[in-house]
Amino acid sequence: MCTPDENDYKTSTDPDTSANTNHTLEKKKRKKRKNTNVACVNCSRLHVSCEAKRPCLRCISKGLTATCVDAPRKKSKYLAGIPNRELPMNIQPDLPPRKIMIPIYNNSSNSSLNVNNMGEQQKFTSPQHIVHKAKFLSNAADSEYSILSNIIYQDTLSNKIPIDILYSNTNSTSNSTIGNSSNNSPTGTNTSPEETEMEKIRQLYSEQRANIPPHPYPSSNQNVYSILLGPNSAKIVASQVNLFANHFPLVPVDSADNSLSFKRLLPRDPSEKSSQINWDSSINQYYLNSETVTFPELAIPLKRRKNHLVSVSLESCSPDAANIKSNVEWEHSLRYSTPMEIYTSINAPFSHTPGFHHLLVYLKHRFNQQDLVKMCRSIAEFRPIFIACSVTLTEEDMIFMEQCYQRTLLEYVKFIAQIGTPTCIWRRNGQISYVNEEFEILCGWTREELLNKMTFIVEIMDDESVRDYFKTLSKVAYRDFRGSEKMKVCRLLSPIKGKIIHCCCMWTLKRDVSGLPLMILGNFMPILN
């Protein structure tokens, strides 16, 4: 048997080997080819090639230059069922720019109006202006989620679409009224975005309350805020601005005699001085009440007797004074004193949106950026829980939640009146909803001063306590469901400037039927040593 020579292997050509070599060379050539251009809308519809520049040559020849824009890219599968207009701008598919859809006429007034509209559309279609409209079944839940998103993402409302425009029907008369007033205003071009937005919110609020009978202006009979709202207190009271819709923080006042006589209208008895401190030397005991002597006024006497055991006693009030106090005009507080009134009279949900908005504005004026970021992180933990609990809630459910709040608050008020522990109740946005008489005596702020306007619990805390407040809030409300937590630091600010009450504060969280934080009960006890 003859064997082939070695040269035969070298000179012979294998067809399979040459084919594989050619295939490898073709692959290398394919890798080096240029990326294909994104076709325009017209070329993509006809499945023909397109060039990079706009308008392309084919659209120029066909006379379709006005609509020659990049074809929108395919959306992700999890966004397939959501319309493009309801998506946040940062995840919307690439759409044709809207500026070419606005014709500019020769008329000067029309052209200026169209240019303004073009600028406004470009502003709201810019990626820097994130617009979110969650698919909640309740307008109240939509509004609250929107303000939480605004707080977390950019900490400002100046470059967002106003909530009253974003979450209202396009064919409503209120929106057209607001739009016309803003466009026809002669000073509209000179106002800042924040002022324009606040003006729209005020107009919307006035329209919403147009059908509600007028209520007495807060503190119309007693000017309790004439000196407690800072240097401009008198002007604020004289302007009769709605203190429930606009926030003005409480400001401590300098007191020469370290008493609260500067804000007491009349003493209980004409023969009794308002600054008189009742003291029983035989048992080293002070007697306090909410009308004449409160705990902050004992700062100096307690320092003098710091080496002695001192006790504090509260003067008992009459049975009539211990009745349940409700006010129909205080929407954030206890409005009715019977369950029947609660279930028959409450027909609208309570909006937490203004409270969150004003809380953020207040924190911005009080704290630096570093502290503000930490507080916003604590608030950010609330968003996923809010989505999970509220996505299926309807407007009727939100009304029922407010009825549950009022009904629960009514029962707690009865219970708190029998305990005697200084207690303050606030909503999940920090707005104070109820205080008992013992809390008035402890901090020096009266019930009318705290509830007759929009007041946040952080207003009467020092800076370190506010920082710990948001840490405690994230623990008790969002991380676990124990329902109780103790603040590490709690120091209350009294109406007397410089007088701080060191306290031990224990939180008790009450949730609604959907799991959302309904109310927070804070029990405060003074630290005497």
Swiss-Prot record:
Residues 1-31, 174-198 are annotated as: Disordered. Residues 40-68 bind DNA. One of its GO terms (biological process) is cellular response to starvation. SUPFAM superfamilies: PYP-like sensor domain (PAS domain), Zn2/Cys6 DNA-binding domain. Keywords: Activator, DNA-binding, Gluconeogenesis, Metal-binding, Nucleus, Transcription, Transcription regulation, Zinc. Transcription factor which regulates nonfermentable carbon utilization. Activator of gluconeogenetic genes. This is Transcription activator of gluconeogenesis. It comes from Saccharomyces cerevisiae (strain YJM789).
